[in-house]
A protein has these predicted regions:
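Short catalytic/signature loops enriched in Gly
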Residues: 2-3, 17-21, 237-326
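ABC ATPase NBD coupling module
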Residues: 21-24, 78-94, 120, 240-245, ...
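Conserved ABC transporter NBD signature motif
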Residues: 69-77
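A short, proline-enriched helix->beta-strand linker immediately N-terminal to the Walker B motif
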Residues: 169-173
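P-loop NTP-binding/switch modules centered on Walker-like glycine-rich loops
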Residues: 176, 180, 184, 188-265
């Protein structure tokens, strides 16, 4: 199966203002990240707040420029595209944002919000555009009268459906969904997740699904990448990640998921706070919180390595992770 997205050694650093004679410092929000997404696949990207996952999503769709590395969408390197070439490429990839209200123009009716990208990219009669917008509203489970309403007239879940319809307007092949259900009540989260799965099949979509909640990611993803302090520390199929985690951070995340059928006495409690990306620890970025860290981890940075079954992990002692309680 062909890759729709290839992310190669992407870095995104932000300069920190320092004194005139001081050495330039950087916040390493994304640090040497590589992965790929196949056509029709959902890649779930999970990690704590501040790990760099949302920044990575913005870099991938060119809302932010990468410091280095390359992003290839449908075989085209979009990393340094500018002007008309960048504008043309944007039809292939769109984003669903975390806060549907903040991402929708309160001064526009829903019909105008969804039709705006179509007007910007396609020369179609107004009647055809309206017909297309009404079709998209139907696809996301909204009635035709939504066309003439404003965003504030809808619930959070309905506003997110409007955002999804807008993302579909140009028929992209790749959608980056940045925490698309985190602002919704639990009762509505599953509805939106099921909608995304239905739309994926209907429109032949691929997703980069970003979330901090592993249980949400499990519901929708084919492959899961676990991110920590700017690095991806593990990649595997959803089943492999949950049944055979090989990174201690992944193991800790899984142990924190509430279990209905058992008491969660084996939860792995990570000590300490997430280090600052402006001052990351030397060696493995996780060693300051890792229950199995050794001296080697304090001095060397583990690289993602293939351990079979399309399972990759960045850990020197992955064979000891199974001994952890959780």
């Amino acid at each position: 199966m062909e890759n729709i997205l290839e992310v190669n050694q992407i870095k995104k650093y932000y300069k920190i203002k320092t004194g005139l004679l001081q050495k330039t410092q950087y916040v390493k929000a994304v640090d040497d990240v590589s992965f790929s997404i196949k056509k029709g696949q959902t890649f779930g990207l999970v990690g704590e707040s501040g790990c760099g996952k949302s920044t990575l999503g913005k870099v991938i769709i060119r809302l932010e420029d990468a410091t280095s590395g390359s992003i290839i969408v449908n075989g085209e390197d979009i990393t340094r595209l500018q002007g008309k070439k960048l504008r043309k490429s944007r039809q292939q990839y769109q984003m669903i944002f975390q806060d549907p209200y903040a991402s929708l123009n309160p001064m526009q009716m829903v019909g105008d919000i969804i039709s705006e990208p179509i007007l910007n990219y396609k020369k179609l009669p107004k009647e055809e555009i309206k017909k297309e917008v009404l079709y998209l509203l139907k696809c996301v489970g909204l009635s035709e009268d939504a066309y003439y309403k404003y965003a504030h007239e809808f619930s959070r879940g309905q506003r997110q459906r409007v955002g999804i319809a807008r993302a579909l307007a140009l028929r992209p092949s790749l959608i980056v969904a940045d925490e698309p259900v985190s602002a919704l009540d639990v009762s509505f989260q599953s509805q939106v997740l099921n909608l995304l799965k239905d739309l994926q099949e209907q429109f032949n979509l691929s997703y980069l699904f970003i979330a901090h909640d592993l249980s949400v990611v499990k519901h929708i993803s084919d492959v899961i990448g676990v991110m920590y302090l700017g690095h991806i520390v593990e990649i595997a199929s959803d089943k492999e990640i949950y049944e055979n985690p090989k990174h201690p951070y992944t193991k800790a995340l899984i142990s924190s998921i509430p279990q209905i059928d058992k008491h969660n006495n084996n939860r792995i409690i990570l000590k300490g706070e997430l280090p600052s990306p402006s001052n990351p620890p030397q060696g493995c970025s996780f060693h300051t919180r890792c229950p199995i860290a050794k001296d080697k981890c304090k001095e060397n940075i583990p690289q993602l390595k293939d351990i079979g079954d399309e399972h990759q992990v960045a850990c020197f002692y992955e064979n000891k992770v199974g001994d952890l309680n959780g």
